[in-house]
A protein has these predicted regions:
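Extended recognition/assembly regions associated with phosphoester-bond processing machinery
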Residues: 2-76, 80-219
Length: 219
């Protein structure tokens, strides 16, 4: 192979890599009918669909409307409760990596049918991916004098609030009272939830998240 051909090949590979997008999504709970019966503090259903069949169909359609076959998708846990429900991932575009959640209790071999890798957490350029939100004391980046952004799932339609992260308050009490009275608590900018209830039931790109967040702006 000539030097010119080699350079062209490297440029082509670089362009292909740049054209691929990284997406994130969490807490799909495919096939989990009980999820569609849960209600919030105000008695409103957490998910606006009748059952898992309807919800799964919507999530599949929306997933493939934004994710291409060569895109990367980090799934931040609680994918499905059964092997049968997990098989919907065959129809979901993208090369998938699982950040394991507390309800992902099937065998590793089951998950490896659909995922390229399984991890407990993962770091990107400025972001830590986890299922459960990481303790705020672990988000400070001393060398860079800034915070990690924790992209997480687990909380469904709720978010990590500044009240919950403040050690001088009773944990969660202020945020809970605000929610009971229909007030959205002030979000902690060090956290971003990719639970389907928070992102329109479809994966969101990492660039989209970065455009919406500023983990430096913290108390």
């Amino acid at each position: 192979m000539s030097l010119t051909t080699l350079c062209r090949e490297k440029c082509r590979e670089k362009k292909e890599q740049m054209s691929k997008t990284t997406f994130l999504i969490g807490c799909t709970h495919f096939g989990h009918d009980k999820m569609y019966k849960f209600v919030d503090y105000n008695g409103k259903k957490i998910r606006p669909f009748e059952n898992a069949k309807e919800g799964d169909a919507v999530m599949l359609e929306r997933w493939n409307s934004v994710v291409g076959v060569d895109d990367k998708v980090y799934v931040l846990g609680d994918v499905a409760f059964t092997s049968e429900s997990l098989s919907i991932l065959k129809k979901c575009n993208g090369k998938k990596i699982l950040i394991q959640g507390n309800h992902d209790n099937l065998s590793v071999s089951e998950y490896m049918k659909y995922f390229k890798d399984i991890r407990s957490s993962h770091k990107l350029d400025g972001e830590i991916l986890s299922h459960i939100p990481i303790h705020p004391n672990s988000l400070w980046r001393q060398k860079k004098n800034t915070n990690w952004l924790n992209i997480h799932a687990h909380l469904h339609n709720q978010t990590v609030s500044l009240a919950q992260a403040d050690p001088d308050t009773e944990q969660g009490s202020i945020a809970d009272m605000e929610r009971i009275h229909g007030i959205e608590p002030k979000k902690d900018p060090r956290y971003f939830s990719v639970c389907v209830e928070r992102i329109g039931y479809k994966p969101i790109s990492i660039d989209g998240i970065r455009n919406l967040t500023n983990p430096k702006s913290v108390v």
